[in-house]
Design a protein with these regions (language model features):
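Non-catalytic interface/targeting segments
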Residues: 1, 71, 76, 159, ...
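N-terminal active-site segment of His-dependent metallophosphoesterases
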Residues: 1-48, 62-64, 68-69, 134-136, ...
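Active-site metal-binding loops of divalent metal-dependent hydrolases
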Residues: 7-11, 35-37, 59-61, 92-93, ...
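A short, polar/proline- and glycine-enriched secondary-structure boundary/capping micro-motif
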Residues: 16, 98-101, 133, 157-166
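Helix-adjacent hinge/juxtasegments
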Residues: 50-95
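Conserved beta-sheet core of the metallophosphoesterase superfamily
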Residues: 54, 81-152
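Charged phosphate-binding loop/patch that engages nucleotide di/tri-phosphates or the phosphate backbone
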Residues: 142-168
């Protein structure tokens, strides 16, 4: 199973589109967005991929509340299952107990990936390139209950993404 993860798109529509295209080009089967989506246009882009997707509200997503029920966006922490993988997703990294197979967060704008016991904690970094001149996203491959994490990042102004396999 191949899961694409992004967070913190903010108002950077082109970077949001490019991150989604990168993840789709890498063959993801699911998309997760860990909040600070900010624009309905960004939710539409996720929905229009025709891939199963799940989003959580971030601290800057008040304008998206009227679209509750129209898109797959939920309050944090949101628990759900993909195939047999139990996932907890939030924007703010406040609910960090290991009560799921994978815990996804955003907000810090920093890529992080750590396996604690049998739980993968992952923050894909920032799509918006606000804190640093990098747009980021991640892919988690789940193979026989093992996690393989790949961090994708692109310097602003560059056409191609850099791929980095991450030890977990």
């Amino acid at each position: 199973m191949r899961i694409g993860i992004l967070s913190d798109s903010h108002t950077e529509t082109e970077l949001h589109r490019e991150a989604i295209e990168q993840l789709i080009g890498e063959g993801v089967e699911y998309l997760l967005h860990a909040g600070d989506i900010m624009l309905e246009e960004h939710l539409k882009m996720l929905a229009e991929t025709n891939l199963p997707y799940v989003c959580v509200y971030g601290n800057n997503d008040m304008a998206l509340i009227p679209f509750n029920g129209q898109y797959n966006i939920f309050q944090e922490p949101y628990y759900f299952t993909i195939e047999e993988l139990k996932i907890k997703m939030m924007h703010m990294p406040y609910f960090m107990s290991a009560d799921a197979d994978m815990v996804v967060s955003g907000h810090t704008h920093l890529f992080e990936s750590e396996l604690k016991g049998e739980t993968l904690f992952i923050n894909p970094g920032e799509v918006c390139a606000r804190e640093k001149p990098l747009s980021e996203c991640a892919i988690v491959d789940v193979i026989e209950n093992k996690f393989n994490v790949t961090h994708y990042f692109k310097q602003l102004g560059q056409a191609s993404w850099t791929k980095r396999e991450v030890e977990v």
